[in-house]
C-alpha cells in the first residue's frame, strides 16, 4: 500500500510489488530467473519523485529493460534500509535468483540506469557460467 499523498503512477506503470521486511526475501526469491530490481524510496523525498517522473516520461525504455519490479518505502520499513546500508534514496538494488548483483544510487538519467542494468545482467551471466 502506498501512503496518502504519494503518487503511485510509477509503481502502477511498472507493476511494482510493495515489499516490507516480512515479504522481501520470498518476493525476491520468487522472481526466479527474472532480473529483479527493488526501488527503495521515501515519503516526501524530492529526488524520489523526480526519479519516478523521469521513469514515467521514458516508460517504454524502462519497460524494454525487462525487469521484475519491486518497491519499498524505507522511511516506513527502516529495517530494510539498515539491512542494505542505505544512506539515501532513491536507490535501486538488482537481484537474480535471490543474489544481490549491484545497486544504483540516485537518478542520473536513463543511460546511467541502463548501464546499471547491463552491469547486473553481466554479473548474473557470469554467475551462471561458473
What are these regions (language model features)?
Residues 49-63:
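Typically the conserved alpha-helix immediately C-terminal to a functionally engaged Cys/Sec
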Residues 83-87:
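A short glycine-leucine-enriched loop at secondary-structure breakpoints
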Residues 88, 93-130:
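Non-catalytic, surface beta->alpha helical segment in thiol-disulfide oxidoreductase systems
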Residues 31-44:
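Short active-site neighborhood of thiol/selenol oxidoreductases, capturing the structured segment around
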Residues 1-34, 116-130:
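N-terminal leader/targeting and pre-domain segments
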Residues 25, 78-81:
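Short hydrophobic/charged patches on amphipathic alpha-helices used for structural packing
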Residues 45-48, 92:
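The canonical Cys-X-X-Cys-His
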Residues 16-19, 40, 59, 63-79:
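Thiol-based oxidoreductase modules, predominantly thioredoxin-like and allied folds used
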Amino acid at each position: 500500500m502506498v501512503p496518502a499523498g504519494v503518487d503511485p503512477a510509477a509503481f502502477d506503470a511498472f507493476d511494482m510489488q510493495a515489499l516490507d521486511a516480512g515479504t522481501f526475501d520470498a518476493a525476491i526469491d520468487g522472481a526466479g530467473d527474472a532480473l529483479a530490481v527493488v526501488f527503495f524510496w521515501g515519503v516526501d523525498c524530492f529526488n524520489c519523485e523526480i526519479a519516478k517522473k523521469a521513469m514515467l516520461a521514458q516508460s517504454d525504455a524502462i519497460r524494454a529493460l525487462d525487469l521484475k519490479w519491486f518497491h519499498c518505502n524505507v522511511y516506513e520499513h527502516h529495517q530494510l534500509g539498515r539491512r542494505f546500508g542505505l544512506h539515501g534514496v532513491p536507490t535501486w538494488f538488482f537481484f537474480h535468483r535471490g543474489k544481490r548483483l549491484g545497486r544504483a544510487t540516485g537518478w542520473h538519467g536513463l543511460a546511467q540506469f541502463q548501464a546499471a542494468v547491463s552491469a547486473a545482467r553481466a554479473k548474473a551471466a557470469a554467475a551462471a557460467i561458473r
